[in-house]
Amino acid sequence: MIKTLHVGLDVGSTTVKIIVMDENLNTIYTDYKRHFSDTKNTICNVLENLIIMYPDTEFTIALTGSGAISAAKFLDLPFIQEVVSCKRAVEKYIPETDVVIELGGEDAKIIYFDKFIEQRMNGTCAG
């Protein structure tokens, strides 16, 4: 029987991050690679390693991050905007959270969880 694993790929301004989860959404693998502005080859290498590590496996894959839109289009994979992705994960796994501050290589984002979700972003730089 072929198993299915779920993959999240975050392509940021400086790095590519991957998480692999089993059918029960337990984390079974993560990796973090600097892409040195070569996102295409870094994504290919990360996905090739995944296929080698988990042969005879089907994958569901979604991409997020500031550098993921073009990759998702090229690979014909779903793209989820990074603030939406973060919000969904926090609501599901840490529902008692009041606020999330996410610092990336390109920007900083803050999400307030209250009666109404409020999101703010500094697009100038992460600092």
Where in the sequence are the language-model features?
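Short glycine-rich, Thr/Ser-proximal phosphate-binding strand/loop in the N-terminal lobe
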Residues: L5-N41, N45, E118, N122-T124
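Short beta-strand-loop/turn "lid" adjacent to the catalytic site in phosphate-handling enzymes
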Residues: E23, Y32-H35, L50-V84, I111-M121
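Short, intrinsically disordered/low-complexity patches at protein termini
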Residues: N41, I51-Y54, I94-E96, G104
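Alpha-helical scaffold segments in soluble metabolic enzymes
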Residues: T42-N45, N49, S70, R88-K92
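Glycine-rich phosphate-binding loop of actin/hexokinase-like ATP-binding domains
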Residues: Q81-G127
